[in-house]
């Protein structure tokens, strides 16, 4: 459908059907409000998308840790499940083994989201590009066009805000066909044999390197041909959570050994008495287990260089690649200046923003901001206002970062605002942090840190449940 004629009953328009837009549309419809979801693909595609499916995962297939007690992103998972998140439902239904992480079959995940939205009676999906500001008669709009917002819409937003959109680069990791990996060299094992959702403790493929192999690999990364930047891209920074592997290598020869190639928690069964100097890990990318992505191997190497360099990795000498790595430019808003606490544009409150373009980083973070934007948009339509969750929750802490928290002033220069993953550093401190363990002994070192995270998580889950009960009347998750 491509009609822009608004339905007779009140409606919210959501522009962009990625993770944030799909979640926003779902939450609006769950609240009993009609929604028109606009998606430009396949009418107009992007340099990173490969399909016309909704909520397509263009980078990793991992939603990261699912540990709600000890990890901030796992906590955000738990809060979103309590809030009836479609993205989390689809992720849980399409998970693949990934140690302690929640990873998904990307095609199955996108298909599940697409099906749920297409079948909802209050959701109309329009395949069209919104090539400027939404029409004035659209009085309640969620813009969730993501980091790959089309140029005409980005220019229109920039003109409305009189604010230059910020930008950074994201890099994409290669995907390898499982049957092309040499299993006389590689082996299955999760780090420290950790068992995660849908996993067995042997969920990653590991390729070992000697010191000599590692040194040669680092040299090849640094010397390999890279994609050239256009003049207007040269000052665009990388997001540190998605640095190309060759950029990490340039920062120091040992950087990779302390990052994605760290050799800890793993034992090579082919040579158990010799500790590898470095290890390359691959993670299952689809439910069939036929594809594996190279963990942490985002890259801007040219395709020929990728084939040459990555086939020097032991076990990948004959690797066949389903997808090579790539690089794309992301844009995001100066949200603390431009958006209010409900994610509305101060210059035009009928427009609300959601997802990665607000300055969050990560699949789950983007979807969670879409979730709140959808709830807030639905409340607006019936003349109500929805206060954000308390900052003690993962969702509230992330919203606080986006709409005003954690802004630094550097000397006399402008305030800086950068994309952020959810982390416990965004949470307010505990009033009474734990000092003693269950045995009564004083907590020290790592034990103290673990206890603090668990206390922050327990407080967050209690507070999100209280917020749901007070504002949303949703049933608690089991």
UniProtKB/Swiss-Prot annotation:
The keyword Ion transport does not apply. It is an enzyme of class 2 (transferase). GO terms for molecular function: flavin adenine dinucleotide binding; tRNA (uracil(54)-C5)-methyltransferase activity, 5,10-methylenetetrahydrofolate-dependent. Residues 438-448 have a biased composition (Basic and acidic residues). Keywords: Cytoplasm, FAD, Flavoprotein, Methyltransferase, NAD, NADP, Transferase, tRNA processing. InterPro entries: FAD/NAD-bd_sf, MnmG-rel, MnmG-rel_CS, MnmG_N, TrmFO. Its cofactor is FAD. Residues 429-448 are annotated as: Disordered. The keyword rRNA-binding does not apply. One of its GO terms (cellular component) is cytosol. SUPFAM superfamilies: FAD/NAD(P)-binding domain (SSF51905). FAD binds at residues 16-21. Its EC number is 2.1.1.74. It catalyses: uridine(54) in tRNA + (6R)-5,10-methylene-5,6,7,8-tetrahydrofolate + NADH + H(+) = 5-methyluridine(54) in tRNA + (6S)-5,6,7,8-tetrahydrofolate + NAD(+); uridine(54) in tRNA + (6R)-5,10-methylene-5,6,7,8-tetrahydrofolate + NADPH + H(+) = 5-methyluridine(54) in tRNA + (6S)-5,6,7,8-tetrahydrofolate + NADP(+). Catalyzes the folate-dependent formation of 5-methyl-uridine at position 54 (M-5-U54) in all tRNAs. PANTHER family: GLUCOSE INHIBITED DIVISION PROTEIN A, METHYLENETETRAHYDROFOLATE--TRNA-(URACIL-5-)-METHYLTRANSFERASE TRMFO. Belongs to the MnmG family. TrmFO subfamily. This is Methylenetetrahydrofolate--tRNA-(uracil-5-)-methyltransferase TrmFO. The lineage of its organism: Bacteria, Pseudomonadati, Pseudomonadota, Alphaproteobacteria, Hyphomicrobiales. The gene is trmFO.
